[in-house]
């Protein structure tokens, strides 16, 4: 370009169509017109520049990198973009459904019984959403949840022995037989319906809030009592107090010699003896409020086993541990430790109670209720040797290994899963994996360590489904090629487990965790999207709750009758739903004259007169069909498939499929794997709707088998008729009956 400018210094600034300058080498050149006859006149040296601006120059489509094969004039690009096969729009319309409650299960089973024979739009859409929901889940024989997050310590200490022990219905395994039995019965009852899953989630969330509120109130009371301590305990104000969430179970890891010496120097004494008596006993010596120098413990054997029968160990004259590790004579009162197997508090917290010893009235023993819990490795929880809390390491070194909870020895199928259908079980465990649901393990704090406890003890059937996503994040792609079924053994799943009623919740509004959200996800050409959104979501979806598809008022009792109240303005056309395309469509009216010859055809004779037409004629006829009809026509025969394939560039759309390519160096990148051509599921636009010519619903109620009239001819006395009443000539009057009451 620079050479041209140097050679033609005149042409650089010349824009006149009537330039009279004579051509001179290196100065100017001749004037020429546009070869494509766009009307432009310019110097011949500017021909390449004009091609960049000429409106008649043929250029590839702007979406050529996305698969559009068309090359067209520059002035036709804007018009082409409206029908460009690569200009694809994805519909992001969302709707929500509630799971079917337990009380409605029977009625929904009867409604789903004849779903294939009776074409009901609301039932077809609900079953489609259910299939897409189940296909989006993963098949698993054991429900697993791989979470890398660190759970907060859930060990809490209570100072009141009268805390109400409410069994938590969150899937935790309790060691107490009574509480576990109640939890087992509640779990068996709740898992038989999807509504029970909602109760599990709600009750779990509510119990957590109530427990936290109770513990916070208890902590405040202890702080107030600690401020009113007697003068005997005022020297302990500068001591370090342990936080309630950090104490965990009684008995932590052993002190090192350095930590013991530092603690002894801080107390001003080399021993850790305490002087307690029953007269000065108050809540300040408990939990959050007690000073460390008042606590003396007896060294216990670390190999002591606490599971099995409950045992008590009352030691009133044990030796105190000094800073140097030696023992002193029993010159003062020691705090003994009494371990007893008892019922666990909600959330598996440990309850510590300070109570007098039976052997010595002046002694106080520390009683601890520890459930027979087991960690995921199967070993029983071993109690530490003494009350030693200070530590810089709060976590046990972890390692990755495949474990299960079979060592908990819970009976097979404890939740009664064999009594419910696969759909209810799949949706139940889908809810269980949501926030507040059941996990396979739970991290708790025991002996100042975080230990993972098993919480799921049942093996799921091979067809039970589990998911790694939250409930609110599960999306249903309604397009034909969008959802890739992941079921190894697919089944029809005809029993409806989702509510027929669609719930619309704005995106900025919070949704219930037990509500399933579905996304349309269909792909359309840009010019087809407006009609799809108006007809499908604005007209059909909005009318499924009683306007377009009107059900019998007795449908709750099992009546499956329904009628289509609205239909397109075209005479005889009706709305249908195709299960394979997962989309709605318009079926035009078929004349009875066209159906008669097919009934009289003799087997063996050629009755397909349409296929005998020339290819060009068939191609012209197919050009008048919409995308929904072309998808149906392509499944008729190979000839019709070839005809529809010839219309893909003009009527179809192209979708890019990406694949991950790995290089020898080790890095990878995403590249276009292939370009897929297909038709959209859009149908011809319906501008007007009209009422269908059908009978009234009252005519159906006259012969509805569920409309049983119950005549009550026997008089039913009022509650107040049991008292003394006056009699009149006509008999018992209501006024006389009510008079004594008034």
Swiss-Prot record:
Biological processes annotated in GO: chromatin organization; chromosome condensation; chromosome segregation; gene expression; protein ubiquitination
Record PROSITE patterns: FBOX (PS50181), ZF_TRAF (PS50145)
Positions bearing Phosphoserine: 379
GO MF assignments: ubiquitin protein ligase activity; zinc ion binding
Region (Disordered): 214-242
Occurrences of domain F-box (ranges): 607-653
Keyword Transmembrane helix in annotation: no
Zinc fingers (TRAF-type) by residue: 49-108
PTMs per UniProt: Auto-ubiquitinated.
UniProt biased composition (Basic and acidic residues): 225-242
Record CDD domains: F-box_FBXO30 (cd22174)
InterPro entries xrefs: F-box-like_dom_sf (IPR036047), F-box_dom (IPR001810), Fbxo30/Fbxo40 (IPR031890), Znf_RING/FYVE/PHD (IPR013083), Znf_TRAF (IPR001293), Znf_TRAF_N (IPR043013)
Functional pathway: Protein modification; protein ubiquitination
Swiss-Prot/TrEMBL keywords: Metal-binding, Phosphoprotein, Ubl conjugation, Ubl conjugation pathway, Zinc, Zinc-finger
PANTHER family: F-BOX ONLY PROTEIN 30, PROTEIN CBG16327
Quaternary assembly: Part of a SCF (SKP1-cullin-F-box) protein ligase complex. Interacts with SKP1, CUL1 and RBX1/ROC1.
Function: Substrate-recognition component of the SCF (SKP1-CUL1-F-box protein)-type E3 ubiquitin ligase complex. Required for muscle atrophy following denervation.
Name the record gives this protein: F-box only protein 30
Organism: Rattus norvegicus
């Amino acid at each position: 370009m620079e050479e041209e400018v140097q050679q033609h210094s005149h042409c650089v600034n010349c824009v006149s169509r009537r330039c009279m300058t004579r051509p001179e080498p290196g100065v100017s050149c001749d004037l020429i017109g546009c070869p494509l006859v766009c009307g432009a006149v310019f110097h011949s040296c500017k021909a390449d520049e004009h091609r960049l601006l000429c409106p008649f120059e043929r250029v590839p489509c702007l979406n050529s990198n996305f698969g559009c094969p068309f090359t067209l004039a520059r002035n036709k690009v804007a018009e082409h973009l409206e029908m460009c096969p690569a200009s694809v729009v994805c519909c992001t319309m969302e709707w929500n459904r509630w799971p079917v409650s337990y009380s409605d299960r029977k009625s929904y089973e009867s409604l789903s019984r004849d779903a294939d024979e009776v074409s009901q739009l609301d039932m077809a859409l609900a079953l489609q959403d259910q299939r897409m929901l189940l296909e989006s889940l993963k098949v698993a024989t054991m429900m697993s949840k791989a979470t890398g997050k660190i759970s907060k310590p859930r060990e809490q200490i209570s100072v009141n022995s009268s805390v109400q022990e409410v069994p938590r219905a969150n899937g935790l395994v309790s060691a107490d037989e009574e509480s576990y039995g109640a939890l087992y019965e509640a779990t068996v009852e709740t898992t038989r319906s999807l509504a029970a899953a909602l109760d599990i989630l709600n009750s779990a969330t509510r119990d957590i809030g109530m427990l936290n509120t109770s513990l916070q109130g208890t902590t405040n009371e202890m702080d107030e009592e600690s401020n009113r301590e007697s003068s005997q305990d005022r020297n302990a104000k500068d001591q370090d107090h342990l936080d309630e969430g950090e104490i965990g179970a009684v008995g932590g890891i052993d002190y090192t010699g350095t930590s013991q010496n530092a603690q002894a120097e801080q107390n001003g004494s080399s021993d850790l003896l305490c002087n307690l008596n029953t007269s000065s006993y108050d809540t300040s010596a408990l939990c959050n409020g007690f000073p460390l120098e008042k606590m003396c413990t007896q060294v216990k054997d670390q190999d002591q086993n606490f599971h099995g029968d409950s045992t008590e160990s009352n030691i009133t004259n044990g030796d105190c541990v000094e800073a140097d590790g030696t023992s002193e004579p029993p010159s003062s009162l020691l705090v003994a430790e009494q371990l007893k197997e008892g019922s666990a508090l909600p959330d598996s917290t440990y309850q510590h109670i300070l109570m007098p010893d039976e052997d010595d009235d002046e002694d106080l023993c520390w009683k601890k209720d520890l459930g027979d819990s087991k960690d995921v490795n199967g070993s029983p929880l071993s109690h530490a040797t003494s009350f030693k809390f200070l530590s810089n390491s709060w976590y046990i070194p972890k390692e990755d290994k495949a474990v299960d909870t079979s060592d908990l020895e819970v009976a097979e199928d404890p939740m009664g899963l064999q009594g419910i259908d696969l759909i209810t079980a799949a949706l139940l465990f889908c809810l269980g994996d949501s926030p507040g649901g059941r996990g396979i393990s739970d991290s708790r704090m025991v002996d100042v360590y975080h230990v993972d406890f098993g919480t799921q003890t049942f093996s799921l059937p091979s067809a039970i489904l589990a998911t790694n996503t939250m409930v609110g994040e599960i999306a249903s792609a309604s397009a034909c090629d969008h959802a890739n079924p992941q079921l190894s053994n697919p089944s029809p799943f005809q029993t409806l487990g989702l509510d027929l009623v669609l719930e619309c919740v704005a995106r900025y509004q919070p949704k219930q965790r037990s509500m399933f959200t579905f996304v349309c996800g269909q792909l359309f050409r840009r010019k087809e999207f407006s009609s799809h959104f108006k007809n499908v979501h604005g007209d059909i979806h909005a009318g499924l709750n009683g306007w377009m598809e009107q059900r019998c008022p007795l449908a709750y009792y099992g009546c499956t009758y329904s009628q289509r109240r609205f239909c397109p303005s075209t005479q005889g056309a009706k709305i249908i739903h195709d299960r394979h395309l997962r989309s709605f469509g318009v079926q035009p009216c078929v004349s009875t004259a066209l159906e008669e010859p097919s009934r009289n055809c003799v087997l063996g004779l050629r009755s397909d007169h349409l296929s005998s037409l020339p290819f060009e004629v068939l191609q012209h006829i197919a050009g008048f069909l919409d995308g929904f009809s072309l998808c149906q026509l392509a499944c008729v025969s190979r000839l019709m498939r070839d005809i529809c394939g010839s219309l893909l560039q003009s009527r179809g759309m192209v979708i890019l499929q990406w694949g991950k390519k790995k290089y020898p160096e080790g890095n990878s990148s995403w590249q276009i794997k292939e370009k897929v051509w297909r038709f959209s599921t859009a149908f011809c636009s319906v501008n007007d709707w009209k009422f269908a010519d059908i009978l009234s619903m009252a005519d159906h109620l006259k012969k509805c088998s569920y409309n049983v009239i119950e005549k009550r001819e026997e008089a039913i006395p009022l509650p107040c008729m049991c008292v003394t009443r006056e009699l009149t000539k006509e008999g018992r009057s209501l006024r006389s009956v009510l008079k004594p009451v008034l």
